[in-house]
Amino acid sequence: MKHNNVKIMPLGGQAEAGKSMYSIEVNGKIFIIDAGYRFPDLDKLGVDIIIPSFDYLIERKKDIVAIIITHAHNDVMAALPYLLNAIQGVPVYAPNLTADLIEMMIDHYQRHQKKNLHMELIRVKRDDSIKIAGIPVEFFPETHSIPGSVGVAIWTPDGYVVYGGEFIIDFGSPEGFRCNIQKMMEIGKKGVLALMVESSGASNPGYTSPNHKLTNKIESMFEDAPGRIIISSYAQNVFR
């Protein structure tokens, strides 16, 4: 998408599960939103992970002002070490828990790959309003399966570009998981040029149930089980 001095380019995460990465350019300044990987299809033998192509970002390295990571899931943050290896020197913005896990991930990468990465990690609060390279950037809390998740709104002359990522609306979630619909409304009133949200379940009718509603579904299974129960779950689904 190109609109006056605004360019939005998906570098991953389109028509695929995982590998999310987007370039949002405002007046020649590039914001990278998320940097994830995805697992390969079964026929990709010998391939452990698939990351986005960084060729465009390497060409435009001098114009990149920030990497923003919205939450601590591998599909949106685990390609970050590879990205920093390609374009070192770009500051990384992330909420607190995400920043903690980024530090652990970078340390693991450096020890196993025998490479030193320079990373300027800037922690943000979930409802921060800051400026990056002179451009206003708004963060807003979202409800996801890991605490500290945020959405991002980047100012442009024609309205905000809002990146919602992965979220549900649930006012009953515990602190840390809770969304802030008021902050979203305030951004909406200021004017929105483009809204970008995750849509893997968009073809399903109805609404996504909050995680805590699983309790009643599986409680009877625990009560009636004659022996040991083994349950598999997504490792980074902290709520469950």
Regions found by a protein language model. Name each.
Residues 1-68, 73-240:
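His/Asp/Glu-rich metal-coordinating catalytic cores
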